[in-house]
Regions:
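Active-site neighborhood of HAD-like aspartate-dependent phosphohydrolases
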Residues: 1-53
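Short hydrophobic segments within beta-strands
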Residues: 8, 91-93, 145
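Short catalytic/ligand-binding loop motif for oxyanion handling, primarily in non-cytosolic enzymes
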Residues: 14-16, 22, 88, 97-101, ...
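Anion (oxyanion) recognition and catalysis
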Residues: 25, 79-83, 156
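Short, acidic loop-to-helix structural element flanking the phosphoryl-transfer center
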Residues: 51, 57-90, 97-102
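A structural signal for isolated positions on well-ordered beta-strands in alpha/beta enzyme cores
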Residues: 87-89, 143, 161-163
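A short, structured active-site edge motif that brings together acidic residues
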Residues: 89-96, 105, 111-129
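Conserved Lys-Pro-Asp/Glu-containing loop-to-beta segment of HAD-superfamily phosphomonoesterases
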Residues: 126-156
Length: 163
C-alpha cells in the first residue's frame, strides 16, 4: 500500500472558519449564536447565500489567506505521520487567484514544513472537488481527510478511504 493521505486544507489543516469569523467581524458582520454546527456561512451569519458566497470569495482572495492559523493539533499529527513515512497531498477549493494560491502554499509550508508532495489550492469552491478527485485519484487506495460531507462522499465514490 502506498502510504499517502490526501488532505483538504480548510477545516483539516487550517482553521479557516476562525479566520473568516475574524475577517467578517472586521467587515461589520457578527456571527449568530450557536451556529458552530453549520458549514454554510449563510446560516452562521444569517445572510443570503449569494452574499455569503461573495464574501467568501473576497476573503479567499485577500491577504488573510496567508495567515490562517493551523487547525487544532494538525501540525502535531501531520509531523508524526510524516516522520513514520506517510506522504501528503493537499487539495483545496480556495480561489483561482494565483496570488491567493501562493499565499496559501507559503502559509502551509510555514506552519507544517516541507511535508507535502503536492499542493493544489486553485479549485473553485463553487464548483467543488468531484471531477478533480475523479481525474487525479480514481482507483487509488489513499486516505482522504475532508471536513465537507459532500466532498468526502465524492472521494469515497471513486475509491478513496474518506475520513
Amino acid at each position: 500500500m502506498d502510504r499517502k493521505i490526501i488532505l483538504d486544507c480548510d477545516g483539516v489543516l487550517l482553521d479557516w472558519a476562525y479566520a473568516f469569523d475574524v475577517w467578517m467581524f472586521e467587515q461589520g458582520y457578527k456571527r449568530l449564536p450557536d451556529t458552530d454546527k453549520y458549514y454554510d456561512q449563510s446560516l452562521r451569519y444569517g445572510i443570503n447565500n449569494n452574499i455569503a458566497n461573495d464574501l467568501i470569495k473576497v476573503f479567499n482572495e485577500s491577504g488573510c489567506v496567508g495567515f490562517i492559523p493551523a487547525y487544532k493539533d494538525s501540525v502535531e499529527y501531520i509531523t508524526k505521520l510524516y516522520n513514520v513515512g506517510w506522504r501528503f497531498e493537499v487539495i483545496s477549493c480556495l480561489d483561482r487567484d494565483k496570488y491567493a494560491q501562493k499565499l496559501r502554499v507559503n502559509n502551509l509550508i510555514h506552519l507544517f514544513g516541507n511535508v507535502f508532495d503536492f499542493i493544489d489550492c486553485g479549485l473553485d469552491f463553487k464548483v467543488g472537488k468531484k471531477q478533480y478527485l475523479l481525474d487525479r485519484y480514481s482507483g487509488k487506495d489513499y486516505y482522504w481527510i475532508e471536513d465537507s460531507v459532500d466532498h468526502a462522499e465524492s472521494g469515497r465514490k471513486i475509491g478513496l478511504k474518506s475520513i
